[in-house]
From Swiss-Prot:
Its EC number is 3.5.1.88. The active site is at 135. The keyword Metal-binding applies. Its cofactor is Fe(2+). It comes from Saccharophagus degradans (strain 2-40 / ATCC 43961 / DSM 17024). This is Peptide deformylase. It catalyses: N-terminal N-formyl-L-methionyl-[peptide] + H2O = N-terminal L-methionyl-[peptide] + formate. Keywords: Hydrolase, Iron, Metal-binding, Protein biosynthesis. GO terms for molecular function: metal ion binding; peptide deformylase activity. Removes the formyl group from the N-terminal Met of newly synthesized proteins. Requires at least a dipeptide for an efficient rate of reaction. N-terminal L-methionine is a prerequisite for activity but the enzyme has broad specificity at other positions.
């Protein structure tokens, strides 16, 4: 297993639309293992392949007690079951140190493949529903900061760009 570098906002590669996985094979299973290792090291509760510059529809989630075991979603699709929404404070490994309230559908159905290529369907609730939607946004080139005002998004962008410049200067 290997730690993968996580892309950070405003890196334009985060806006890439992920392609469906054609075949769940050893290459994809190795990617999944590397993504879990990277997510745990960060530490985080979810990671999309887009965040590690692999533009295929793969995401991993581990909410500890809430999910009982780590979850893998390959080629996920989502169906919104009703119009009820709730707000949740979200953060992101690609937008480190920033948290904002995001409104998302409360009742959803997700269809995906597991790490063995077997289809499954779930109707997640609570944090799992939020996390699945957040990670699926990454596969579509969208970030949680896209849900906040343009002024807030620009402020976050400027702060992260400043942090990147300072980090580059301290290395050089």
């Amino acid at each position: 297993m290997a730690l993968l570098p996580i892309l950070e906002f405003p890196d334009p590669r985060l806006r890439t639309i992920a392609k469906p996985v054609a075949k769940v094979d050893q290459r994809i299973r190795t990617l999944i293992d590397d993504m879990f290792e990277t997510m745990y090291d960060a530490p985080g509760i979810g990671l999309a392949a887009t965040q590690v510059n692999v533009h295929e529809q793969v995401l991993v989630i581990d909410l500890g007690e809430e999910t009982k075991e780590p979850m893998v979603f390959i080629n996920p699709s989502i169906e919104i079951l009703d119009q009820e929404h709730y707000e949740y404070e979200e953060g992101c490994l690609s937008v480190p140190g920033f948290y904002e309230q995001v409104s998302r559908p409360k009742h959803i159905r997700v269809t995906a493949l597991d790490r063995d290529g077997k289809e499954f369907v779930i109707e997640p609730e609570g944090l799992l529903a939020v996390c699945v939607q957040h990670e699926m946004d990454h596969l579509n080139g969208k970030l949680f900061v896209d849900y906040v005002s343009n002024i807030k998004r620009q402020r976050i962008r400027k702060k992260l760009e400043k942090q990147h410049r300072q980090a580059a200067q301290s290395v050089g």
